[in-house]
């Protein structure tokens, strides 16, 4: 009889913890997230293009979009770094070199943001991703100031849009 009661209590406790954990991991409302994004059509396309986002909870979506932001920043950095190496025009080389520094700063800010993401600190994530967004944005401005073809930093727009999604998600965490 005691073994039966112990078994029932154990099973009830186990069910309680399983159900409580399930409640915390609710499917994120992608429509609501994209409705708050700066570029709603980009957000919707981005979410639909990645099968991992379907049925994901908020933390998982944050991880997915944050990973995309890191990839985008790294790709932009590599592209501009290669332009520095091949530029023969001193003005262009100066603009590209400036952009390399801005992208390094963005990547550094994203690396700092990883801790906030891992701990579920939405506010910290928001602050650090916002800081990361400044680098490529300043790079675009530098390109305009130096009168260099801004298509060299086309990647910056995607980076900004992806980070914008991360910001929306961070505000919901």
UniProtKB/Swiss-Prot annotation:
Where does the signal peptide begin and end?
A: 1-25
Gene3D superfamilies according to UniProt: Invertase/pectin methylesterase inhibitor family protein (1.20.140.40)
Q: Which GO terms describe its molecular function?
A: pectinesterase inhibitor activity
Disulphide bond pairs: 34-43, 99-139
Q: Which UniProt keywords apply?
A: Apoplast, Disulfide bond, Glycoprotein, Secreted, Signal
What does the record give as the function of this protein?
Inhibits pectin methylesterase (PME) from flowers, siliques and pollen tube.
Stretches assigned to coiled coil: none
Q: Where does it localize? A: Secreted, Extracellular space, Apoplast
Query: Which GO BP terms apply?
Result: pollen tube growth
Question: A GO CC term?
Answer: endomembrane system
Give the matching InterPro entries: Invertase/methylesterase_inhib, PCW_Enzyme_Inhibitor, Pectinesterase_inhib_dom, PMEI_plant
Q: Native species of this protein?
A: Arabidopsis thaliana
Which family, according to the similarity comment?
Belongs to the PMEI family.
Annotated protein name in UniProt: Pectinesterase inhibitor 2
Q: What else is known?
A: The polarized accumulation at the pollen tube apex depends at least in part on local endocytosis at the flanks of the tip.
Main localization, broad class? secreted
Q: In which tissues is it expressed?
A: Highest expression in flowers. Expressed exclusively at the pollen tube tip.
SUPFAM superfamilies assigned to the protein according to its UniProt record, in alphabetical order:
Plant invertase/pectin methylesterase inhibitor
Mind telling me which NCBIfam families this protein's record contains? PME_inhib
Subunit-level organization: Interacts with PPME1.
At which residues is glycosylation annotated?
39, 63
């Amino acid at each position: 009889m005691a073994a039966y009661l112990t078994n029932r209590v154990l099973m009830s406790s186990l069910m309680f913890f399983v159900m409580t954990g399930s409640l915390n991991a609710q499917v994120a409302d992608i429509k609501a997230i994209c409705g708050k994004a700066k570029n709603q059509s980009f957000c919707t396309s981005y979410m639909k293009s990645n099968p991992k986002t379907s049925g994901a909870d908020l933390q998982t979506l944050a991880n997915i979009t944050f990973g995309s932001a890191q990839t985008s920043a790294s790709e932009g950095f590599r592209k501009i770094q290669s332009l520095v190496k091949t530029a023969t025009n001193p003005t262009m080389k100066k603009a590209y070199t400036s952009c390399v520094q801005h992208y390094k700063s963005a990547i550094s800010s994203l690396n700092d943001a990883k801790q906030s993401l891992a701990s579920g600190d939405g506010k910290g994530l928001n602050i650090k991703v916002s800081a990361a967004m400044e680098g490529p944005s300043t790079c675009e401005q530098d390109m305009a100031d130096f009168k260099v073809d801004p298509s060299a930093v086309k990647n910056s727009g995607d980076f900004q849009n992806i980070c914008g999604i991360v910001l929306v998600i961070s505000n919901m965490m």
